[in-house]
């Protein structure tokens, strides 16, 4: 991996995407809850979402967050939120948006993570891909234009809606501010890429 430095604002973007990816793809353990509890947001909406996440994490246990995660994303039959591009764009899982994403991943040299059973169009997987594109996890940081095209094709059409659904989900406690943070990041990215 080329260790060329990335701009501070891009490091923040990559960190936010990585945080969202981690929280969406797996149940937070005690170490993760402790790290979340230690976060301090700055002024503004994103900072407020980070502070809310931090405060709630202080009162959560691994068992309580596991229950919440299972109700939200797994459920009996299905969870309250199905965080997949295919579902949001077509109403079904494993559809054309997933096939299109897999093609783009091949083109960019992005490999499916080993040991992951979720389809690649899962919101958490897409957040991890964006973090990797920004930070250089796939060899070197990808050009902003490549990031923009990927975001506009595979994330922008649906992810803000998904994060908004998570933010408002009946069972969301820890995941309500995760939804807020994701919704806000999607809005910032859309606006930034629009004026780029």
Describe each model-derived feature in a short phrase.
Residues 1-196:
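Surface/interface-facing alpha-helical segments and adjacent flexible terminal/loop regions used
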């Amino acid at each position: 991996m080329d260790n060329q430095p990335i701009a501070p604002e891009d490091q923040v973007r990559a960190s936010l995407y990585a945080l969202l990816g981690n929280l969406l793809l797996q149940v937070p353990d005690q170490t993760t809850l402790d790290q979340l509890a230690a976060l301090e947001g700055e002024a503004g909406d994103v900072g407020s979402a980070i502070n809310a996440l931090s405060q709630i994490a202080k009162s959560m246990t691994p068992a309580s967050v596991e229950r919440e995660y299972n109700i939200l994303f797994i459920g009996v039959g299905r969870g309250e939120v199905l965080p997949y591009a295919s579902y949001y764009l077509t109403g079904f899982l494993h559809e054309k948006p997933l096939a299109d994403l897999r093609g783009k991943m091949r083109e960019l040299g992005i490999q499916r993570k080993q040991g992951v059973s979720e389809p690649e169009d899962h919101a958490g997987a897409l957040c991890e891909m964006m973090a990797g594109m920004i930070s250089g996890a796939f060899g070197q940081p990808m050009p902003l234009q490549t990031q923009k095209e990927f975001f506009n094709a595979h994330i922008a059409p649906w992810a803000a809606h998904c994060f908004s659904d998570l933010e408002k989900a009946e069972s969301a406690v820890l995941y309500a501010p995760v939804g807020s943070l994701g919704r806000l990041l999607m809005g910032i990215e859309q606006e930034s890429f629009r004026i780029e």
